[in-house]
């Protein structure tokens, strides 16, 4: 995990993106083994100290966006396909109209961040 995301959100997707870039295409929870996150309980209590919540999302999402050029939601939706049933190796994202509309939103957000932050 990257220290830049500590503490808080973004470290899991960052690790997944690193694995994706290395060619890993199987991302699956194994049987009943699960990681349960308690909805940012720790970081919410320390929010003002560690995080700045902005109109572009939390700090972890902003770091991920600046580092990879896409946000966590886009990565999970179009690359990891988190809301779908596991069917083996993942392929490159399906570049349809929804992909490009979502990508446009992400790039506009990135432009905004670079311009004003």
Write out the residue ranges for each language-model feature.
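A short, conserved alpha-helix in the catalytic core of glycosyltransferases
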Residues: 4-34
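Positions that flank functional sites
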Residues: 34-35, 80
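Conserved active-site-proximal loop/helix segments of enzymes involved in bacterial cell-wall
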Residues: 38
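C-terminal, non-catalytic tails of nucleotide-sugar-dependent glycosyltransferases
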Residues: 26-27, 42-117
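Short, polar/flexible loop-turn hinges at active-site or ligand-entry regions and domain interfaces
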Residues: 1-2, 50
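Residues at helix-coil transition
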Residues: 1, 21, 66-69
